[in-house]
Amino acid sequence: LVTEDIHPCGMDILIGEPNIEIVRVKNIDPETLRTAVRDVDAIIVRSAIFSADILQEARKLKIVSRHGVGCDNIDVDHLSARGIPVAIASGSNALSVAEHTLGLMLATARNLVNQDTSVKRGCWADRNKFRAVDLCGAKIVILGFGRTGRKVAPLCKLLVWKL
């Protein structure tokens, strides 16, 4: 069961496997999922919510793969009690999240949202209202040095920030 769109390369791999029958659903509402899981061996899920109520209907289920890094939308305790593994794409988006973090840091330092709004309104004189902070040589503290934090650090060093 593939609940939502995944990258075309991933779908091509699944389609190319002769022993795999792909089941797709148009809706990810609980009733649709409850029916869809009844005869599947595996589930690939992005954001659909798989509660114990839905998963108990999956009598043949052998694995759930989360197409992403978290699994808050899957009742992992229920699956663990049944001996069914849950796979995640650990670290797959760490660089993207790190780049996004860096972008938000720069936007915040430059008060970019307020500046942009003023320009779009034609309020050119407002530029003096917003304080911008120079970040070159700034000291940066990274709270949490997991997959994402480890990617943020070298990006900060590129900007001559002190960690």
How should each PLM-predicted stretch be described?
Residues 14, 43, 64, 79, ...:
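Generic structural signal for small/hydrophobic residues in well-ordered secondary structure
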Residues 22-28, 45-46, 119-128:
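Short gly/ser/thr-rich secondary-structure transition/capping motifs
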Residues 13, 100, 104, 151, ...:
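Rossmann-fold NAD(P)-dependent oxidoreductase module
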Residues 36-37, 55-58, 135:
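A short, aliphatic-rich alpha-helical micro-motif
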Residues 129-163:
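Rossmann-like dinucleotide/phosphate-binding beta-alpha-beta segment
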